[in-house]
Amino acid sequence: MAELKLGYKASAEQFAPRELVELAVAAEAHGMDSATVSDHFQPWRHEGGHAPFSLAWMTAVGERTTRITLGTSVLTPTFRYNPAVVAQAFATMACLYPGRIFLGVGTGEALNEIATGYQGEWPEFKERFARLRESVRLMRELWRGDRVDFDGEYYRLKGASIYDVPDGGVPIYIAAGGPAVAKYAGRAGDGFICTSGKGEELYKDKLIPAVKEGAAINDRNVDDIDKMIEIKISYDPDPELALENTRFWAPLSLTAEQKHSIDDPIEMEKAADALPIEQVAKRWIVASDPDEAVAKVKDYVDWGLNHLVFHAPGHDQRRFLELFEKDLAPRLRRLG
């Protein structure tokens, strides 16, 4: 079985840059193994929202910490970024913080790409997935080679070199919400990323089997693939606070279909705030008893996920980190 790891999701949509750095530093002090950050150009909310640049954040946190692994969860290397520049940025960070950097990638959302100049109708999944696969191939060729020529359907290189690259390149974690991309993660990813709260059958019957199937295609040991899940958890001994803390993150409770074509944080906020608190809370483990919280998290471990990254919704993140270290971490470590 793969090693059990506990991580912290730094909520870039909720906190300003300096505070977000300090929270990651605190996460290491409270015993977390990793800290991940989303890469949004625009947040889910216009009022009270934030969107610091993920790569600047990673570098700042890297300088302030010594142990935790840092990565994006996730970045889209296909539209507003050129994947060659992403490859250069992550190679540099991996040289600065050896063994501590990974690149988490996904197929992208209209919210972040249309505002930065994408022209035309937002592409359907088939094209976005094709772009992702091509960008991963391109980045790995740059990390392996010298004077690289690449002639893809979407991206091209001519005599390109990255001059500072760690041995072995940079681990790539592939985010998936369905079996097609999960299978690709098993075949081509160093890690796999998914998010919690979407029903047992998705993880147990679709995502994890697809990762295993993809690994088998390339004769890989699935235990060598870091299987990460962002666990949405609102834990507090005060049950009313545990419930109310979820409200800021109401946009996560919108369906993929509802979010697909929304490219404006004001419209996203409006759609999300129309949801009742009970619907918002369904995406979260809302608990005031530590044993109850850990029992719900254990399901994900039993289904085959080993890297548990905890996303807490409340504004008092230091309170969450203290409660996590005291109440949840000792119980969770025993699961491994």
Swiss-Prot record:
Keyword set includes Oxidoreductase: yes
Tell me its EC number(s), please.
Answer: 1.1.98.2
Residues the record lists as binding substrate: T195, K198, K259, R283
Q: Which domain of life is it from?
A: Bacteria
Q: What class of enzyme is it?
A: oxidoreductase
Chain positions recorded as coenzyme F420-(gamma-Glu)n binding sites: D39, T76, T107, G108, N112, G177, G178, A180, V181
Q: Name one GO molecular function term.
A: glucose-6-phosphate dehydrogenase (coenzyme F420) activity
GO terms (BP aspect)? carbohydrate metabolic process
Provide the reaction this enzyme catalyses: oxidized coenzyme F420-(gamma-L-Glu)(n) + D-glucose 6-phosphate + H(+) = 6-phospho-D-glucono-1,5-lactone + reduced coenzyme F420-(gamma-L-Glu)(n)
Keywords for this entry?
A: Carbohydrate metabolism, Oxidoreductase
Q: InterPro entries in the record, alphabetically?
A: F420-dep_G6P_DH, F420-G6PD/mer, F420_G6P_DH-rel, Luciferase-like_dom, Luciferase-like_sf
Active-site feature positions: H40 (proton donor), E109 (proton acceptor)
Q: Which Gene3D superfamilies does this chain map to? A: Luciferase-like domain (3.20.20.30)
PANTHER family found in the cross-reference section: 5,10-METHYLENETETRAHYDROMETHANOPTERIN REDUCTASE (PTHR43244:SF1), PTHR43244
Q: What does this protein do?
A: Catalyzes the coenzyme F420-dependent oxidation of glucose 6-phosphate (G6P) to 6-phosphogluconolactone. Appears to have a role in resistance to oxidative stress, via its consumption of G6P that serves as a source of reducing power to combat oxidative stress in mycobacteria.
Q: How does it assemble?
A: Homodimer.
Family membership: Belongs to the F420-dependent glucose-6-phosphate dehydrogenase family.
What's the protein called, per UniProt?
Answer: F420-dependent glucose-6-phosphate dehydrogenase
Give the species: Mycobacterium avium (strain 104)
- Identify the coding gene: fgd
